[in-house]
Amino acid sequence: MDYVKVIEETGSKYIGFVPDFGCFATKPNKPYWDRALAAGATEEQLNKCAQLRYDEVPLEETMKIMAEDIEKCPALGGTLNSMYGFVQFRKSCTKELEGLKRILPYCFEMHGKCHYVDENLHEVSIPYEEIIPVVAASDYDGFIVTEYEDEGGYDAIEQTTRHVAMVKKLLNQ
């Protein structure tokens, strides 16, 4: 929160934040999960990987625990790496939501990351139903930009349309 302190001390309206909703992920990334299944990984193996991530077992130790499974299905190693890298997730995003509340007055726009929005207008790994109420309860009047990460080969127009509809639904618009 040193950045907030600097913003407050300078009073500048040109210094701020552009939060990326990917940091709130609480479930594994569907496109990576599906890709691993297609490459021969099992639900059991993937669930074990996810649980190790939830339990905050370090990646190096997790790779050792899963070594035999990775040997049988090399794609599992890549999926596991992604769970600790680009598409991380955690049990809860409460701490991150508290951080969002603190920086909201200094946000220019927000990146509404999505990887897969299902037909029921639910992003399966990022808890928009927790994020949007925090934004709605604030004085934020900027944009939430749809940032579709085309990882799974889904229809980008459909995914973007679903994301916009999901956010509007959560905002009761």
Question: Which residues does each PLM region occupy?
Answer:
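Histidine-acidic metal/acid-base catalytic patches
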Residues: 2-173
